[in-house]
Each structure stands twice: as C-alpha cells, then as structure tokens.
Amino acid sequence: MAHKKAGGSSRNGRDSEAKRLGVKRFGGETVLAGSIIVRQRGTKFHAGTNVGLGTDHTLYAKATGKILFEVKGPLNRKYVSIVAE
C-alpha cells in the first residue's frame, strides 16, 4: 500500500470571477438618463430622487443631471439622488 498520495492531484485551483461591483459615477458628475451609478449586492446605497433600483439592486439615473450622495434619516442611510439641471 502506498504511503504517499500520487502526484498531480491538487484539490485547489478554483476561484470565482470578480463581479466588478462598486460606485461607477461619483458625486458632482453629470450623468445621462439610464447611466449606471452603483452596482451592488443588497442596498448599501438607497435610491433617492430621480434614481431607479434594478432587480439586482443596481442604481441608475432616471433623469439627466448631477449626482448627489447624501446620508439622511434616523438610520444614517446613504442615498444617491440626481439633481436635474
């Protein structure tokens, strides 16, 4: 009976592909309607004025304007809004 495992049988070598999440457009930037602002898992950022929430929690601009990030409410939630120009 062999006392050493045969070579070439590593059980490592798998990893998931990066999902490219995060903020795509920053505060003060001008965006067009339909632009993706944040890609996220869950609602780290909440949708404010003129911002829509996709089925995968992606935030996108519903109107053309400047992005405004703000913290408000009793739970100090982060909101993303679009100020129309």
Curated annotation (Swiss-Prot):
Residues 1-20 are annotated as: Disordered. The keyword Transcription regulation does not apply. It comes from the Bacteria. GO terms for molecular function: structural constituent of ribosome. PROSITE patterns: RIBOSOMAL_L27. It holds the Pfam family Ribosomal_L27. Keywords: Ribonucleoprotein, Ribosomal protein. GO terms for biological process: translation. InterPro entries: Ribosomal_bL27 (IPR001684), Ribosomal_bL27_CS (IPR018261). Belongs to the bacterial ribosomal protein bL27 family. This is Large ribosomal subunit protein bL27. It comes from Aeromonas salmonicida (strain A449).
